[in-house]
Amino acid sequence: MKALLDLFRQVQQEEQFDAIKIGLASPEKIRSWSFGEVKKPETINYRTFKPERDGLFCAKIFGPIKDYECLCGKYKRLKHRGVICEKCGVEVTLAKVRRERMGHIELAAPTAHIWFLKSLPSRLGMVLDMTLRDIERVLYFEAFVVVEPGMTPLKKSQIMSEDDYLAKCDEYGEGEFVALMGAEGIRELLRGIDIEKQIETIRAELQATGSEAKIKKFAKRLKVLEAFQRSGIKPDWMILEVLPVLPPELRPLVPLDGGRFATSDLNDLYRRVINRNNRLKRLLELKAPEIIVRNEKRMLQEAVDSLLDNGRRGKAMTGANKRPLKSLAEMIKGKGGRFRQNLLGKRVDYSGRSVIVVGPTLKLHQCGLPKLMALELFKPFIFHKLETMGIATTIKAAKKEVESQTPVVWDILEEVIREHPVMLNRAPTLHRLGIQAFEPVLIEGKAIQLHPLVCAAFNADFDGDQMAVHVPLSLEAQMEARTLMLASNNVLFPANGDPSIVPSQDVVLGLYYTTRDKINGRGEGMTFADISEVIRAYENKEVELASRVNVRITEYDLVNPEADGDARFAPKITLQATTVGRAILSEILPKGLPFSVLNKPLKKKEISRLINTAFRKCGLRETVIFADKLLQSGFRLATRAGISIAIDDMLVPPAKEKIISEAAAKVKEYDKQYMSGLVTDQERYNNVVDIWGAAGDQVGKAMMEQLQTEDVVDRHGKTVKQESFNSIYMMADSGARGSAAQIRQLAGMRGLMAKPDGSIIETPITANFREGLNVLQYFISTHGARKGLADTALKTANSGYLTRRLVDVTQDLVVVEDDCGTSNGVAMKALVEGGEVIEALRDRILGRVVVNDVVNPETQETAIEAGTLLDEDLVELIDSIGVDEVKVRTPLTCDTRYGLCAKCYGRDLGRGVLVNSGEAVGVIAAQSIGEPGTQLTMRTFHIGGAASRAAVASSVEAKATGTVRFTATMRYVTNAKGEQIVISRSGEALITDDHGRERERHKIPYGATLLVHDGQSIKAGTQLATWDPLTRPIISEYSGTIKFENVEEGVTVAKQMDEVTGLSTLVVIDAKRRTSASKGIRPQVKLLDSSGAEVKIPGTDHSVTIGFQVGALITVKDGQQVHVGEVLARIPTESQKTRDITGGLPRVAELFEARSPKDAAVLAEVTGTTSFGKDTKGKQRLVITDLDGNAHEFLIAKEKQVLVHDGQVVNKGEMIVEGPADPHDILRLKGVEELATYIVDEVQDVYRLQGVKINDKHIEVIVRQMLRRVQIVDVGDTKFIPGEQVERSELLDENDKVIAEGKRPATYENLLLGITKASLSTDSFISAASFQETTRVLTEAAIMGKVDDLRGLKENVIVGRLIPAGTGLAYHRARKAKEAADRDRAAAIAEEEAASIFETPAVQQEGDA
C-alpha cells in the first residue's frame, strides 16, 4: 500500500519559484548531475537493438528502455521498483527517466568552451586581458603561454612560439619557468587570477585615466570581473574538464523500416568527442611523442567546439551527406529553435480549422460551427455526458456511441455546446481582435460561418480564408472567454477607440441608397402621421424610397439615467422633414439617440460615427443590437435597391480630347526647346511629367464633375442639378467600394505609370479602361501592377518583423497600480502644420487624465479638477470654453517602477473606460502600431526637380481672423526702408482668437520681410510675411561701413557676369578650386563705425565678423555704408539636390530603432554666440562661446549649409547645420518631452499619410520602453560602474537604498535605445535570448550569474506559468501574499516551539537578543 501511495506522490510535484538563475557549471556540479560516465562511442547493438553498455544510450547510466523492466529481463513489473539488477546494472523504474538523466564524459585534456572564446566580445579575452587571436593560438596549439615566469625576466601570460620556447629553455634552463600550450595553459592563467586585487587596480586606474578609450576598456573588464566576484563563479569554469551528456531521449535514435536509423546530429557529435577522447587517453598512457598528443588534443578541442556550437570557428563538421551537423547551440536559437518553436508557440489540442463562409443570419456573438467539427472538438464532454446519463457504461462504449453518430449523440452535443464559448482565430493575428470568442451554433456543411460585422476586426473576407477554432476547457477559461473575449464585448479597436463593428460594402451601399434624397420623387411633399403610415404608402407604391416627405417621428430623450429599463426615457414627437427611407430606418434607432443622426445620407464614415455615438450614449448592449439591425436592414435594402454597373455608367468627359491635345502641344514645345538647347534633358523630363500629371488631374476633375450631378426637373417645372444616382458614383461616394482614383482609370485617363525602379515613364496612358488599352499601353501598365504584388509580399514580412520587435520591447509593460502620484505630464496643443489644424486638441486629449485644474480662461473658475479622466463631454466643454493647451498625464512621465499606472495611461481604448489593473498595455501598443504596418508603403519618395519646385512657398498668409503673436524665438530688425526683417531661424507667428486660443501657427524663415507686427488684429487672408524662395540672404544686424577681409578676386572670390543685365557680382569660390596658399582663409566682412574702429557686439569685446560661405553672391562693395537689416550676400538655394524622403514602413522602423540619420542636423550644445574658427582640410570650424565665456567647437563639412553666421546668438538645441534631426541629440539637448513629441509626430505623419488612425499614447508607450535604460555618469556610493547602462528602475531602487543609508546616490543621463537594442538589453535574459542573438545573451547571462525575476510576459510563457497580466496578475499577487503569510506563520511556530523548549516567554528572548 505504501508503495502505491508513493507512486501517487511522485506524480504531483508542483514547484513554486519566483526567479530563475543561470550560471556556469563547475566540474563537480556536472559530475553531480551525471548518472555515470559514457566511455564508448557505441549507440545500440545493430542485431539486438539493445543499447550498448557504457555507450551513448547505455541503460545502466540513463535508465531502462521499457517501464519497470531491466535490460536483461530478470526483473519485471512494479513490485521490483527501485531495484538495481545485479546482472545488467539497470535500475527498475519508469522509462521516462531517460528524458532527464544525464551522463558525462571525463575529458583527458581540458578544453575551452567556445561560447566564452568566440562569442564577441570574447569573455576569456576580457578576463585574461589578452587578445582573441593570442588565446586562439594557445588553445589550438600554435603557441605557448607563460604561466609561471619563476625568476626569469619573462612576463605572465606572455605568448611565445615553439622556437622561442625552445630558445628560452636553452637560455634559462629547463624548469626555471613554466609555459604551457592548449586549454591547460589558459586554465592555469584563469586559476591564477586574483579577482579582488584586479578589481581594486582597475578601479584605481579608472580614477586616474582620462582617455575615453581606456575608460571604456577598463569598464568592460571591470564589469566582467565584478560579475564573477558577485556570482561566485570561478573563471576557470569557462574551461571544461567534464562534458555533460544530454539524456538519450532528447537526442533519439529511431529505427526506420529497412534496417536504417534516423538519428539526431548530436549523437554524431558526441561520438566524435568520445572517439577522440579515448584515443587521447590511450596516447597519454603510451607516452606518445608530444607532437602526436598535441594534435590529438587540438582535435578534441575542435570536436567539443562543434558539439557546442558547430560552425562558430573554422569549417562546420558535416555528416555523411555533406550537411553541417546541428549542434546544441542551433537547437535553441532561431525561428526553429527551442525558444520560438516549442516554448513560445506550441500546438494546442482541442482545435480545428476550416474555411469560413458568411453567416448573415447570426447574431454578433454567434458563429456557425459545422456539426462534425463540434463533435470532434467536444468529444470528452460528450463521453462524460453519456456516462453520467447512463447511456454508456465505459469510455470505450461511449466512444463507439459517438462514432456511430446516433441521434442521442446529436442531442447531447447540443446540450454540451450550449453556453460554451469557442474561440475563433484568423492568421495572421496582428492585434488582439484576431482572436475572439463566440457562442457556437451547430450547422450542416463543413464550413465555419462568421458574422459579417466581425470581418473588419479579423481582416477576413470569404475568398477562401480559413479560420481556426479553439475550445476553452476549464471553467475559468470559459468565463474569461465569455466576459473578455466575446465578440459583442469587443466593439472598439484598441488602436484608436473607433468602432470595429462597422458595416462595409453591400450593407453600406444599401443604407446609403435608403437615406439618399431625390428631387421630385414620387409622392414628394406628402405628410404622414407616423412611420407605419409611411411603410403602408411605400408598400403600395405611392412613394419612392428617396422622396422628400414630412413624418411625425417619436424620439426618446434620456431623462433620468438612474432608473432602469424604459423608465429612463421620455418620448417626444416632432414633425420632421425627411425621406421615406430614413423614416423607415428610424424604426431600428435605439432609445436615447435623436433622429437627426439618421437624417442625412449615411456614408461609411457616417455609419461609423453613428455606431460610436450609440456606444457612448446607449451603452454596449444597445449598440450591439443596433449594429445587428443595421446589418440586416443594409443587406435587405441593398438587395431591394438592385444597384448594378453597366458600361454606360462610365461617363467619359467630353473635354478629355481637348485637355489631352493641349498637353501634347505643350510637350512638343518643350521638346523644341530641348532641341535648341534652351533646357537640359532633365528639366525637359521634369516638365513633361508635370504637364501630363496636371492633364490627368484635369481629366479626372472633369469626369467627377460630370458623374457627380445630373439634371432633373423639380415639381415646379424648373431644371435643377442634384447629386447623381449613377451606380458607380454611389458606390464610391458611399464608401462601399472603389474610389475617385479608380473611377478615373475607368472613365478618365490612366495617366502616368512608373517603371520598376520607381521612376516615371514620360509617356502617359491617355486611354481608360472603358475605351480599352492598346498593346503598348497594356505593356507599360504591367510594370506597375507586378511591382505592386512584389511589394505586398515584402511588406508583409517586414511589417511582421517590426511588430515582433515592438512586442518584444514592450512585452513586460503592464498596468500595475492605480495612481503613481506624479505631477508630471506633457502639455497638449492642437496639432498645426502649414497653418492648418491637422488634429484638434479635443481628439488628442480624449481619454487622458489632466494633471492640473483646467481653468476657464474668461471667468478664471476651475472647470475640470486635476486627476479627472477626460471623456467626450469634458473635451466638448474644454473646446467650448476656449482652452487651447491642457497638461495631461502620459506614460512617458509615469513614476511606477516596474510597469505603468492607470492614471498615466488613461482610457483603455478598446473598452472606453479607465484602464484596468493588469492590462498588458505594452503589447496592445505594439500591436496597434504593427497591425496597420501592412498598409504602409515600402517606397522612398524621390522629391526633386519639378515636383519640389512647385511646392516652394514664397509667402505665408493667415487662414483665420484673429490677433498675431510672435513666439519668443522670433527676432527681427527694422531696415532703412522701415521693413521688419527676420533674423531668427526658428521664429513662428501664431494667430489667436478672442479667447487667446491658438488657431494656427506658421514658421517664418530667416530673411523674410514681416508684413504684420506683434499684437496686430488681422483678417483671414492677410499676408504675414514674404521672402525670396530661391536664395538665402545673409543680413547685417548692425550698421557701419563695410571692410572686406580675404575677399580677393581670383583667390577666394570670382567675378560673375550676368548675361542678361550685364551686372557683375562676386562669388565665393569652393576651397577645392583655390590655390593651396588660400585654402584655409575665409572671405569675411567687418563693420567700421564712423571713427573707423571695428563695430563690437554689444556687451562683449568681439568684433562683428560676418563670414561668407561657398557659393555666396556678395552684393555689397568694400567701403559701402550699410544699415541694419540690409542684405550683404545671397546664397542660391536652387542647387538643392533631389533628395530621397524615406517613407512608409522603413521610416517607422528607422524612428523606433533610433537610428541617427546620415547627414544629420547639428544642434547647438550650449546657448551662446557663434563665431568661425580656422578652417581645417574640408571642414569648417564653428565656435559657440557660452555665457561664461567657454568655447565649444564644432567641425562641419564644407558642403553643409551652416544656418548661422558670425556673431549670431543661438539657443541650446537650436539647429545650426541643416539636415534631418538626430533623436539622440534631441534627447540630450532638449529632454525627454521634446524627443517624445518628435518621435510621436514623425511616426504619426507616416500613418496619417495612409489614413491610419493610431492613438498617440501607443507610440508614447514604445518611447517609454526605448528610454528605460540610463547611463551612469557619477557612481556616488552605489555598486555601479561609470558609463554603465542600467535599467532605470534598478538605478532608482539602488539610489533609494543608498539615500536611506545617508550616502551619495548615482547621477545618470537618459539613454535612447532602438527597439532591437532595448529588447536585447532587458534585465530578463530569458526574454532577450528568445528574441535575437541567443548565444551572446546566454553567454553574458551565464558569466554574470544573472537572475531572471520573471517580471515580463514572455519569460512566464516560456517557463509555462500564468502571465503576470490580466487575471494572471491577481493570481501571482495572491500567490506571493500567501507565500509571505506562510513564511511568517512558519517563523511564528518555530519561535513558539523554541520558547516552549526553554520554558521562557518569547518576548523575553527578544529582549535579550
UniProtKB/Swiss-Prot annotation:
* Assigned GO CC terms: DNA-directed RNA polymerase complex
Which residues participate in Zn(2+) 1 binding? C70, C72, C85, C88
Q: Where does Zn(2+) 2 bind?
A: C820, C894, C901, C904
Q: What is its EC number?
A: 2.7.7.6
For this protein, the record's SUPFAM superfamilies field holds: beta and beta-prime subunits of DNA dependent RNA-polymerase
Task: Please give the superkingdom of this protein's source.
Answer: Bacteria
Keyword list, A-Z: DNA-directed RNA polymerase, Magnesium, Metal-binding, Nucleotidyltransferase, Transcription, Transferase, Zinc
In this chain, Mg(2+) is annotated as bound at D461, D463, D465
How are cofactors bound according to the entry's free-text note?
A: Binds 1 Mg(2+) ion per subunit. Binds 2 Zn(2+) ions per subunit.
- Cofactor (UniProt): Mg(2+); Zn(2+)
A GO molecular function term, named singly, is:
zinc ion binding
Q: Which reaction does it catalyse?
A: RNA(n) + a ribonucleoside 5'-triphosphate = RNA(n+1) + diphosphate
The family database entries (Pfam families) matched by this protein are listed as: RNA_pol_Rpb1_1 (PF04997), RNA_pol_Rpb1_2 (PF00623), RNA_pol_Rpb1_3 (PF04983), RNA_pol_Rpb1_4 (PF05000), RNA_pol_Rpb1_5 (PF04998)
The Gene Ontology biological process annotation of the record reads: DNA-templated transcription
Q: How does it assemble?
A: The RNAP catalytic core consists of 2 alpha, 1 beta, 1 beta' and 1 omega subunit. When a sigma factor is associated with the core the holoenzyme is formed, which can initiate transcription.
Question: What is the role of the protein in this entry?
Answer: DNA-dependent RNA polymerase catalyzes the transcription of DNA into RNA using the four ribonucleoside triphosphates as substrates.
User: Which family does the record assign?
Assistant: Belongs to the RNA polymerase beta' chain family.
Q: What is the protein's given name?
A: DNA-directed RNA polymerase subunit beta'
Task: Record the organism.
Answer: Ralstonia nicotianae (strain ATCC BAA-1114 / GMI1000)
